[in-house]
């Protein structure tokens, strides 16, 4: 939610930012907000003036009663003032509702470094890491997508897609999951289950070392938390509601972590608050018909380890760089080649002022795919959830800034590991950093093994 003071003092900045985002229909909202706000403030001023007048009359009534003088005329006048105040208060309340309707539906103000664009095609790669394995048939596309800034090894054999590897390795059952739950669900099996859990513990351990407090949040939250954390459109496209309850299944641990300190004034000395949340995530994926229908890349349910930061406003941009670097370090240790992308205005979403994605190179698919998103939401969520801080009790509270980043979404990390660490025969080598968590160094095709996890 935007600060009404920003709109009052710099409406052109807000209009220009909406233009950058391609939200042309909402530009006219700013003039409407200013008009409503002027009416609201004028009526508040009138209310305060009437209250002052009523107080003066009350004092005069007291004086007259002491003297035994008549007060009927003053009492009648006081009653008229009370009626007028009550009427104005209703008008003020209605005006506030109208203003809030607009404020709650305006996107965050973008950072100057966010590239202007219309879609994901306009996102800007800013750095690359790792040595990619590239099938010769994908080489031209890889060179274009990597801008010639990545090392690579050309493969004469064609790498398999993760969905085919899962079948070869006995790692998932999609047919039975579809029977039980429908599309975009899965049973994970055998070593892939161990790999999923290993990724969670690996990411958790790495972030605890960096000072993050581990949290298993509630998997369901009330509507006010979702309204405070995300946009209203997500209620239709992303979020599952529990029928008959004021509860929603979380699409990410970000949301319960954002709501954790709702309606609180934090002690400034405790900032930044660093949390690492571990949870399942539930998503409708309503707007993705036809995309990634096979496999585990885009599914209704998955596990995720999430970084969440409450920071001082003046420190949030530094923390944004830190949390994306934290995620990069995880993927470097998993030996996954990737690029970091600065998300453009048209693909940014409403909540973030700036967002980075990590896109892992997927040899089977022959393209980079998103595995991490890291956002600085500045005070957009904090205003909606009323999360403030102060350094002294006599100081006016200020809104915190909130930031979030994927550490690891296990399903997508598994896709990246399978496609990047596969051998020609379908064997998948486990990244060395995970050995102590998995207890095995590779996963071999079903036809080559007797049972799960045998040495």
Swiss-Prot record:
L-serine binds at residues 252-254, 306, 406. ATP binds at residues 283-285, 299, 370-373. Pathway: Aminoacyl-tRNA biosynthesis; selenocysteinyl-tRNA(Sec) biosynthesis; L-seryl-tRNA(Sec) from L-serine and tRNA(Sec): step 1/1. The keyword Aminoacyl-tRNA synthetase applies. Transmembrane segments: none annotated. Coiled coil: none annotated. The keyword Nucleotide-binding applies. Its EC number is 6.1.1.11. Keywords: Aminoacyl-tRNA synthetase, ATP-binding, Cytoplasm, Ligase, Nucleotide-binding, Protein biosynthesis. One of its GO terms (cellular component) is cytoplasm. GO terms for biological process: selenocysteine biosynthetic process; seryl-tRNA aminoacylation. GO terms for molecular function: ATP binding; serine-tRNA ligase activity. It catalyses: tRNA(Ser) + L-serine + ATP = L-seryl-tRNA(Ser) + AMP + diphosphate + H(+); tRNA(Sec) + L-serine + ATP = L-seryl-tRNA(Sec) + AMP + diphosphate + H(+). Gene3D superfamilies: Bira Bifunctional Protein, Domain 2 (3.30.930.10), Serine-tRNA synthetase, tRNA binding domain (1.10.287.40). It is found in: Cytoplasm. Catalyzes the attachment of serine to tRNA(Ser). Is also able to aminoacylate tRNA(Sec) with serine, to form the misacylated tRNA L-seryl-tRNA(Sec), which will be further converted into selenocysteinyl-tRNA(Sec). Homodimer. The tRNA molecule binds across the dimer. PANTHER family: SERYL-TRNA SYNTHETASE. Belongs to the class-II aminoacyl-tRNA synthetase family. Type-1 seryl-tRNA synthetase subfamily. NCBIfam families: serS (TIGR00414). Consists of two distinct domains, a catalytic core and a N-terminal extension that is involved in tRNA binding. This is Serine--tRNA ligase.
């Amino acid at each position: 939610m935007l600060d009404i003071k920003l709109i009052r003092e710099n409406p052109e900045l807000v209009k220009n930012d909406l233009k950058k985002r391609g939200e042309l229909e909402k530009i006219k909202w700013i003039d409407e907000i200013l008009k409503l706000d002027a009416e609201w403030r004028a009526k508040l001023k009138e209310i305060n003036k009437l209250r002052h007048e009523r107080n003066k009359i009350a004092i005069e009534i007291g004086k007259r009663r002491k003297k035994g003088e008549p007060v009927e005329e003053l009492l009648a006048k006081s009653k008229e003032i009370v009626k007028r105040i009550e009427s104005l208060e209703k008008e003020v309340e209605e005006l506030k509702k109208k203003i809030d309707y607009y404020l709650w539906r305006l996107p965050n103000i973008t950072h100057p470094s966010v590239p202007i664009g219309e879609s994901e095609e306009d996102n800007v790669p800013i750095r690359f890491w790792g040595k990619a394995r590239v099938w010769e048939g994908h080489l031209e596309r890889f060179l274009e997508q990597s801008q010639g800034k990545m090392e690579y090894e050309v493969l004469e054999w064609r790498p398999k897609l993760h969905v085919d590897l899962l079948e070869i390795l006995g790692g998932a059952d999609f047919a039975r999951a579809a029977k039980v739950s429908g599309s975009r669900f899965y049973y994970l099996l055998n070593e892939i289950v161990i790999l999923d859990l290993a990724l969670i513990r690996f990411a958790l351990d790495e972030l605890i070392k960096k000072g993050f407090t581990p949290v298993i949040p509630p998997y369901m939250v009330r509507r006010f938390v979702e309204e405070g954390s995300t946009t209203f459109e997500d209620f239709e496209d992303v979020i599952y509601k529990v029928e008959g309850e004021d509860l929603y299944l979380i699409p990410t641990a970000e949301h319960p972590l954002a709501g954790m300190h709702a309606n609180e004034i934090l002690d400034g000395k405790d900032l930044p608050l660093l949390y690492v949340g571990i949870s399942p995530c539930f998503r409708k994926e309503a707007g993705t018909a036809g995309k990634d229908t096979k496999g585990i890349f885009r599914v209704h349910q998955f596990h995720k380890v999430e970084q969440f930061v409450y920071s001082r406003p003046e420190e949030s941009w530094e923390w944004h760089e830190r949390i994306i670097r934290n995620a990069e370090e995880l993927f470097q240790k998993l030996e996954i080649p990737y690029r970091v992308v600065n998300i453009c205005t048209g693909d940014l979403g409403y909540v973030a002022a700036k967002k980075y994605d990590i896109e892992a190179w997927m040899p089977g698919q022959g393209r980079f795919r998103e595995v991490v998103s890291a956002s600085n939401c500045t005070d957009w969520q904090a205003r909606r959830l009323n999360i403030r801080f102060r350094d002294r009790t006599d100081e006016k509270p200020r809104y915190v800034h909130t930031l979030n980043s994927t550490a690891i979404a296990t399903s997508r990390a598994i896709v990246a590991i399978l496609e990047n660490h596969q051998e020609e025969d379908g064997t998948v080598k486990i990244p060395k950093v995970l050995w102590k968590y998995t207890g095995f160094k590779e996963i071999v095709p079903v036809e080559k093994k007797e049972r799960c996890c045998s040495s």
